[in-house]
Each structure stands twice: as structure tokens, then as C-alpha cells.
Amino acid sequence: MTAPRVPALFTDLYELTMLQAYWAEGMTGPAVFDLFARKLPKRNFLLACGLEQVLDYLEAFAVSGQDIDYLRDLGRFRPDFLERLRALRFTGHVYAMAEGTPLFADEPLLTVEAPMPEAQVVETAVLNLLHYPTLVASKGARVMQAAQGRGVVDFGARRAHGVDAAIACARALYIAGYDGTSNVEAGRRYGIPVVGTVAHSYVQAHASEAESFIRFAAEFPGTTLLVDTYDTLDGVRQVIDLAERLGDRFQVSAVRLDSGDLGALAKAARALLDDAGMPQVHIMASGGLDEHAIAALLADGAPIDGFGVGTTVDVVADRPYLDAAYKLVAYDGRDCGKLSPGKLSLPGRKQVFRRHVDGVAAGDTIARHDEQLPGEPLLNCVMQHGRRLPAGRVDTAGARAHAATQLARLPAALRALEPAEPYPVAISPALQAARQALVAAHPKLETP
């Protein structure tokens, strides 16, 4: 299902002032912009995500009459500019890594090639639409690694930074490997399995915990019951007692622990359930979890079968931003690049080649786009003349499958939570020469 259209005026003011200046100066030649991360945010890799939303935005880009009226009222823009803006559409090409592809610092996640005004005005939205999903998917992949094959579901909608963020987060986490989400709209929009249990309020609203368990299990046989409203282990005992007394009239598939010492409580709950002859009842844990908490629980032998993970992942609490940039790398056939210290760009349109040894990623090379080097080219043309190509029509399920395959091909050390030796990313001799030429054109600069 198509997401709501991103407004054309979701842009920074200076994109529009530059656009007026470009048109006034006749600067409408072909431009190439790269979107990339300058460094990894306490991660061994990033996981590309958000491309579908970028392509939706570019295909639908149009400035409405109401938009023009608002801009006119600002008193900043010339009438002829506003009329030209009214007719503006995106007609360029887009090259991108497929969603679910691991990537590393300085590698273009996406390249836009279009007339300068078109390529410039979309900067804000393109960065926004790729930044957060990539950040979340990268965090989610770490959670899945920590879970060691156990199920993980997204519980973070209520504390995500806005409605749109919650929906984008659910999609990104599903691509990263989560099994589902509690967010019903995300499930409807992207075909993600929706899951849910019951809240403490439901238990509290009944005369007793036992009554709430009976009523809910009768309404939803095979459900998961939340057992920590009053006393976690007493709640587990209530489940056991009701199962013994009511038999098939009380069908429960799991109990959920949401507070306290989850490791100790899980061990005690497992012992109670097993002693009662209920090994088939699973234990699910939630409450302030992230990859580190999950790894610690499992390292301690906690018999937890699945996890509900919310706040700390949805807001990416340990690294809530990505040092992403959208930079001009070529204009009108001329290489360009930012040359300030610490932010030296790689000029020109590029390709990234990934080499594998025995099925495991062994190193990447960032090259000029027309080079032919060993390895798998990662940047594919996903949009041409403003229209999506087959490579840009991969749905959420397809992106999830691609992520699973690509993550499995990373070296084990990169998939671990601990910092690993940096993955080798080389720059081809031809691209190095292009960068040297760019620096040489500014003699006060030195190559780092």
C-alpha cells in the first residue's frame, strides 16, 4: 500500500533560494549528488533502508497551487520563479544500493543524477527518508544478532519520535529481521505481521488477575498473557492453576515478563511451567531491552523464547543520528567535491564493488562508475528519467529476504556486537587520481 505523499515543501529554505539562483544563472546542467555516511556510528556496518520511500517521493514530486501561494506570501521569490517551480518534476536518474545491503563509511548509499535544480531541491527529503530507516535497520540487525535465532517483535510505536517515525521504524526493523510489529498501520501498509498481547490495564480493570486471564484466553485462545502486573511468579502460578482446572477451555501459548530481573524471573517461571508439565508454554520478555540487554540475558542462560523490543531501538538511544551527507560530486561534466579538512569528498559518479571469498564478504572498492573491477557492483540504476525501474520495485518482503542473505555473508566478527577491525574499503587508483586532480586544482590543500 502506498504511503502518504511527502510534501514538496518538505525542504530547507535554502534549497529554494538556490533553485531560484540556479535558474536565474542558467545553471541547469546535469548534476550528480552522492548520499553517504562519513563514519560508522558505533557500528561495524550500516544496513541500507528507506529507498522505497525515496523513490515514492521522487515519482510524486509536485508543487501544488497552495504551495505556490504560500511561497508567494513569503515575499522572497520572484513571480517567474514561482511559475517555473509550479511545473517542476523530477526527471533524473537514481542509482542505489538495494535495501538490506550492508555498507560502510564513505560508500554511496544513493546517487542522484539530474538537472541541477531537480537534484538540489530534493536534498532535504532524500536525506530524511534514508537517514532514520538506515539508522534503525542497522540497530535492528544488531538486536537480531544478539537474539541468536529467537523471535523479536517491535513494540516501540508509542515512544517513537512521531507517527511517521514509528511506521518507518517498524518497516526498517522487519527488513533487519524482526518477526513482526505491534503497529497495526505499519502492518497494513507494508505487509508486516502484526502481533500483540495484553496491557496491564486490562488485568487491572478486572476484579482479579485470574479473571482477566480467563476472559482474555477465552476471547483469544492460544494467546500470550502478561503475568507481571502484581507479582510475576504468582502470575505464572495463576496460569498453571487455570490450565490445570480448565484444560482446553484455557489455551495459552506464552507468558510475558515485562519488569523486574528478567533473567532470574525467566528461570523461575520456566521451572514452574516445566514442573507443571507445560514445557510448550513459551516465555517472552520485554521492558527496556536492546541488543546488549538481550545478549546479557542469554549469556546468563535465561530461558527466554522471544523478545518485545521498543523504546531504546526505535529512538536508537545509543546513537540517535547518522553522520550522513548529500554532496555534489559532479556538475556539467566536471568533477566536484568538498575539500575542507576532515570532509574531503570523493569526486564523480561512483560504483562500489564487493569481493567475496568462499561466500564471505572480503572487501569493497569504491571506484569510478565506468570502471570494471572484480566483485559484485552494489549500486544499481533504480530510477531513470523520473520513473522507477524493476530494480527499484523490490517490496518490503523482498528487502527483508535480501538483508538476511547479505547479513549472512558478512564476516562473523562484523556481525558481533563488539567493535571489530574495520572492514577493508579501498579506493580505486582511478578514483584516487580524480581526487588528487581535484586537490591539485586548489593548491593550498593537501591530500590527507
Segments and roles (model prediction):
Residues S201-A361:
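Glycine-rich phosphate/ribose-binding loops and adjacent secondary-structure elements
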